């Protein structure tokens, strides 16, 4: 089983994640863009949009580095559900739910049905190795060369990224991740070793009719579940 989206460009953006720990906000922004790309259009956004939401969802204060501490994914997603992800001309509201991060089949279903899976991973120092041109390893894998640094998950901290497609389901089959404004290849065994949380997002304002996207009673049930979650979190 594979999910081939090589003919569709989700055009991920950096959205400030090269200078700030706003990967949770950038992940939501790029999820919007991935969803739009699958529907045949695109949604414009910029660094200011991502930083504004990062501030709203985490308490980051621009110009005060001590407040740049990243975000907790469920808290950030709850902020998006409650307040929306504000862009210059519109505010987009997701509904969302969490999945068992050890259930890779479930994550594949999220990726296929909801445009991309929103993941939290523990990066290793070996994942952050760069060649002489400043490029990351072409494929993230668990058998990185010894000179690439510590391969221990978490030795480079946590990160939020999106899973976009995959060539198969075997351990060494490749997935495409959307992170830092680019497509990054990894193996499924890398995903298994690094993943710590997984979430699905759906955008009622963006999706095109048809396909695997929830509609009708399924959509109503998701909305009701999110409303109940917000009521409990209030």
Where would I find each of the regions flagged by the language model?
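Catalytic-core signature of thiol
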Residues: 1-234
């Amino acid at each position: 089983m594979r999910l081939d989206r090589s003919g569709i460009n989700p055009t991920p953006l950096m959205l400030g994640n090269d200078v700030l720990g706003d990967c949770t906000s950038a992940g939501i922004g790029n999820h919007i863009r991935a969803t739009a790309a699958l529907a045949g259009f695109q949604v414009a956004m910029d660094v200011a949009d991502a930083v504004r939401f990062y501030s709203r969802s985490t308490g980051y204060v621009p110009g005060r580095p001590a407040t740049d501490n990243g975000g907790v994914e469920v808290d950030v997603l709850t902020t998006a559900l409650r307040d929306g992800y504000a862009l210059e001309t519109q505010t987009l509201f997701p509904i969302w739910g969490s999945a068992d991060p050890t259930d890779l089949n479930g994550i594949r279903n999220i990726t296929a049905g909801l445009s991309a899976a929103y993941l939290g991973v523990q990066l290793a120092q070996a994942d952050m190795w760069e060649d002489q041109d400043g490029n990351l390893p072409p494929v993230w894998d668990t058998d990185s060369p010894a000179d690439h640094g510590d391969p221990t998950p978490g030795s480079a901290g946590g990160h939020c990224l999106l899973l976009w497609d995959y060539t198969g389901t075997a351990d060494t089959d490749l997935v495409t991740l959307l992170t830092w404004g680019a497509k990054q290849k990894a193996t499924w065994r890398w995903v298994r070793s690094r993943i710590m949380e997984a979430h699905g997002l759906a955008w009622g304002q963006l999706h095109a009719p048809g396909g695997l996207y929830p509609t009708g009673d399924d959509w109503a049930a998701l909305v009701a579940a999110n409303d109940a979650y917000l009521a409990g979190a209030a």
